[in-house]
Amino acid sequence: MPNTTKNQVAAADKVRSYAKGVDQAPRKVGLVASLVRGRTVNDALVILAHTPKRAAKPVIKAIESARANAINNHGFDGKTLIISTLSVTTGTRLKRFVPASRGRALPFQKKSSNILVEVTGALKPVKATPATAEKEPTKEESK
């Protein structure tokens, strides 16, 4: 299941997004993540768009997923979102072998990463609805 994204809510004020199985070592992804940790979401996306690292792409996807969850599912204002947590942990390791001389095989591991993004921000103000006038019951309601 490489590059799957799992989304959930931690608390009322934080929204999480996971990107699991990113096919790159966590040490390399962590370097990119440290560039944008603690910044606003919009600033982070601009910085990552101009970062010449392969790891920037999955970090962008995870941040955009967290932003979309916060706006669409939880009613946050997109302009006020801040990355409160951006952590990179080790994912599953694939054990492989590379051929060597004299019929030998040398083992190595393909590393993967899990990215966790938590965003916080202000909720959108709820628009006041106009007072609804008393309406006459319809035929179905009067029965």
Predicted segments with their positions:
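Short acidic DE-rich linear segments
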Residues: 137-143
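Structured, basic alpha/beta domains of bacterial-type, RNA-associated proteins
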Residues: 2-24, 28-35, 39-137
